[in-house]
């Protein structure tokens, strides 16, 4: 089994069967408290939860965020996620396509996933550090074409790589690679973190590089320091991974920083968002979409219906937050009053 494939299996085992969450740090949404509106002047049953993102209309402002399915179970997991996304009318991002491109393994990331995710946006995914390597920029368009994607996620994950055995430790030139990427792909480029967050300063550099959208993927949910520590056999790195378990910028902080500087930049909030109320708070802080990965992974290992049930519960809670703030449309949450 290839090293990358084995690592993906370890990731899956860690997230599904062990507590890989941050210990003390949260995503920061407890600091946002809506003011209750006793005269909402809207009908609960007709509240509009639909939204538009990068030119696509979505029934709900949700994204099935990029996640690893592991080599053994990737195809089943990705197919269930795609089926659920299509049924719900929400967007879906696939996990890293590095293995499928470099080792000729589909891992559920071929044309089938496009057929299952019919009628909804589907996003490709590659690591920024790998794109910097000579000759690898062309992999971006290959990744898009492999699944007929509507946009390309490029994940920036330096701290995860630092804790990873044989990870990409040299990040010199990564921003330049991102700048060079724009003319090589025919879809929008979305930069995302993996759970450590993107600051306002880094967002500015990314905007200057020409990216189309950002997924803040902030701290507060799964700790990828902890996950990589679990996968390590080096005791020094294991200890260091535990020390840095809570490293990162809370998701709410990322949103506030970036939205203040870029009022119109398409933003995705992910990282430590567990329910529809927290999704409402993320939208209030400026998110256009709300993504979940770890929170829905276990459901995806069981059935498509459980994934659908999960997001329908999220939608109910989001609708309640809209009603309680007098927001007839989900986008009106940006103007909801706070205590």
From Swiss-Prot:
Substrate binds at residues 7-8, 96-98, 160. It is found in: Cytoplasm. GO terms for molecular function: FMN binding; isopentenyl-diphosphate delta-isomerase activity; magnesium ion binding; NADPH binding; oxidoreductase activity. Gene3D superfamilies: Aldolase class I. It catalyses: isopentenyl diphosphate = dimethylallyl diphosphate. This is Isopentenyl-diphosphate delta-isomerase. HAMAP family: Idi_2. It is an enzyme of class 5 (isomerase). Its cofactor is FMN; NADPH; Mg(2+). The keyword Magnesium applies. Its EC number is 5.3.3.2. Involved in the biosynthesis of isoprenoids. Catalyzes the 1,3-allylic rearrangement of the homoallylic substrate isopentenyl (IPP) to its allylic isomer, dimethylallyl diphosphate (DMAPP). GO terms for cellular component: cytoplasm. Pfam families: FMN_dh. One of its GO terms (biological process) is isoprenoid biosynthetic process. Belongs to the IPP isomerase type 2 family. It comes from the Bacteria. FMN binds at residues 65-68, 96, 125, 192, 222, 293-294. Its main location: cytoplasm. Keywords: Cytoplasm, Flavoprotein, FMN, Isomerase, Isoprene biosynthesis, Magnesium, Metal-binding, NADP. SMART domains: IMPDH. Mg(2+) binds at residue 161. The gene is fni. Homooctamer. Dimer of tetramers.
